[in-house]
Amino acid sequence: GSTLDLTRPSRQRLGDDAAIARLTRELETGAVAVLVTSGVNPIHELPEGGQWAELLTKVPVWVAVAERVDETAALARYLCPSPHPFESWGDYEPIAGTVCLRQPTTAAVGDTRSLDASLAAWSGAPLAAEELLRARWRDAVFDASTDGPSFDAFCDRSRRDGWNRRSDPAVAALHFD
């Protein structure tokens, strides 16, 4: 059978406990001056969530980009509302080499902006989320794809199918902890 495919592993739930431990130490020493959190709720999800609640509130500039006010976003110094996935453009790579495209299925209910669009605006180069996604796909997905005579045809096919395949997926070495 082919239960495990080690050449194209799942890229879902790629948590990094060592990175969390490093960030915890940096928060404890006051080494973090600016922190942007998005799509995470460490105060609720981590075993040491209570400690994180105390540490995060000491960060001078802490911005939470969140779809809802959860335990973590409620304590942030700045809260930027982000759209629900049904309201926004996005992409993800659930399996190495298979890049999926998410497009809005409904209009945004509130005045929200995606993390990508917020970062672009804060850096002085405001672009709509769809434009940012197209630029990323032009640079990172289209050049490495195995099909598509032109970028526009490639985008049309990807929007229609909801995914495309990269010919050179960057596959990290697998290890089991």
List each language-model region with its residue ranges.
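Non-catalytic alpha/beta scaffold blocks inside enzyme catalytic domains
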Residues: 1-155
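Long, low-complexity segments enriched in small/aliphatic residues
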Residues: 139-177
